[in-house]
From Swiss-Prot:
The modification N6,N6-dimethyllysine is found at K55. GO terms for molecular function: GTP binding; GTPase activity; translation elongation factor activity. Residues 91-94 are annotated as: G3. The modification N6-methyllysine is found at K261. SUPFAM superfamilies: EF-Tu/eEF-1alpha/eIF2-gamma C-terminal domain, P-loop containing nucleoside triphosphate hydrolases, Translation proteins. GTP binds at residues 14-21, 91-95, 153-156. This is Elongation factor 1-alpha. Residues 153-156 are annotated as: G4. Residues 70-74 are annotated as: G2. It is found in: Cytoplasm.
Length: 449
């Protein structure tokens, strides 16, 4: 058997009616793990409801409805295969929590597929000041999604159909915008497609014979293989802590960076509690080592369940152990906030698995969110659409890191009433040593060896 294909995560972005669902549905339909029987059922229902426009979006609508109703659908439905990769669509932006998910990063996307609607009016709506094309592209870049594929969709609906002139015009406009955001347009494939008719999705289309570049499938194969951060020091934010009879205390979480293995002495930030890892398990199987992306449970010695909680971060005690933050400086973008944000604002921050109120202690600068240039020092307030550097103070002990060193622990969302009002990236952290940190006997013994 050959080497298993590499897994990559894709996020599909773009304006409301650009055809994201149809395009994603088409890929999953043609290349994915959807059972043919399920497809037939959907097709029959679509015909009964007279949804002639069914094609592929219907597949996705059904999956979404089932997902939102809490029916656990087989996640294989969101996967498809290319020659080189197993691709998972980690989120499609119709989803309510799309922006939060992108930031708190249940999984970090390796590539963004930006879908553009080139029809007259459609394109202008997407790229206008309020259009989501801009916001999504900016978010993707700010959150470290380095690679992008741009699909000029609905080529079957341009005037005239499959218009090269319209495609050229779109490429020019979108390139200049993406350049302002921070992407290098020369490294982006601009693929003219029809998610509905299937042109250039998987096979070359004779309707687009003027286009000589890759199909969408080829472009996905040309993504650079992502480097997984297993060589960095360990960071494992806890999602839960269980007490399991006969075993003891078992913290659970996802390895974000580094590796964890039995026998390692770990320090939990922010409390500084240090102990030895007895065993590491994933899907009820013991592991000799867990890598980034693995969701694991691990058993720790001489530790009570009360000593650990969600939001704590496990780290290697001998390799840059995690500590609490006294304060940190972030670049924040205000998104859906109705009022003004000034010094003293204290919302709840979602950063990795922690959910803690943080005070905006000082607004340091206001910056141009497109270019990053400073516009004003010590602004009185920030409002919708503004970006700025802010010094923040956690109201309770919490672990954060700079985005540059540990990306998953360096980005956050500010949410009020289930609405994301701001997103941020952490630029600097002032750490503090814990007071009275407990070192278990097992850890002390290990350290003395």
């Amino acid at each position: 058997m050959g080497k298993e294909k590499v897994h990559i995560n894709i996020v599909v972005i773009g304006h409301v009616d650009s055809g994201k669902s149809t395009t994603t549905g088409h890929l999953i339909y043609k290349l994915g793990g959807i059972d043919k029987r399920v497809i037939e059922r959907f097709e029959k229902e679509a015909a009964e409801m007279n949804k002639r426009s069914f094609k592929y979006a219907w597949v996705l609508d059904k999956l979404k409805a089932e997902r939102e109703r809490g029916i656990t659908i087989d996640i294989a439905l969101w996967k498809f295969e290319t020659n080189k990769y197993y691709c998972t669509v980690i989120d499609a932006p119709g989803h309510r929590d799309f922006i939060k998910n992108m930031i708190t990063g249940t999984s970090q996307a390796d590539c963004a597929v930006l879908i553009i609607d080139p029809t007259t009016g459609g394109f202008e709506a997407g790229i206008s000041k309020d259009g989501q094309t801009r916001e999504h592209a900016l978010l993707a870049f700010t959150l470290g999604v380095k690679q992008m594929i741009c699909c000029c969709n609905k080529m079957d609906a341009t005037t005239p159909k499959y218009s090269k002139a319209r495609y050229d015009e779109i490429v020019k406009e979108v390139s200049s915008y993406l350049k302002k955001v921070g992407y290098n347009p020369e490294k982006i494939a601009f693929v003219p497609i029809s998610g509905f008719e299937g042109d250039n999705m998987i096979e070359r289309s004779t309707n687009l014979d003027w286009y000589k570049g890759p199909t969408l499938l080829d472009a996905l194969d040309q993504i650079n293989e992502p480097k997984r951060p297993s060589d960095k020091p360990l960071r494992l934010p806890l999602q839960d802590v269980y007490k399991i009879g006969g075993i003891g205390t078992v913290p659970v979480g996802r390895v974000e960076t580094g590796t964890i293995k039995p026998g390692m002495v770990v320090t939990f930030g922010p409390s500084g509690l240090t102990t030895e890892v007895k065993s590491v398990e994933m899907h009820h199987e013991s592991l000799l080592e867990a890598l980034p992306g693995d969701n694991v449970g691990f058993n720790v010695k001489n530790v009570s369940v009360k000593d650990l909680k969600r939001g704590y971060v496990a780290s290697n005690s001998k390799d840059d152990p995690a500590k609490g933050a006294a304060s940190f400086t972030s670049q924040v973008i205000i998104m859906n906030h109705p009022g003004q944000i000034g010094n003293g604002y204290a919302p709840v921050l979602d950063c990795h698995t922690s959910h803690i109120a943080v005070k905006f202690a000082e607004l340091l600068t206001k910056i141009d969110r497109r270019s990053g240039k400073e516009l004003e020092k010590e602004p009185k307030f920030l409002k919708n659409g503004d970006a700025g550097m802010v010094k923040m103070l956690p109201t309770k002990p919490m672990v954060v890191e700079t985005f540059a060193e540990y990306p998953p622990l360096g980005r956050f969302a500010v949410r009020v009433m289930r609405q994301t009002v701001a997103v941020g990236v952490i630029k600097a952290v002032e750490k503090k040593d814990p007071t009275g940190a407990k070192v278990t006997k097992a850890a002390a013994k290990k350290g003395a060896k």
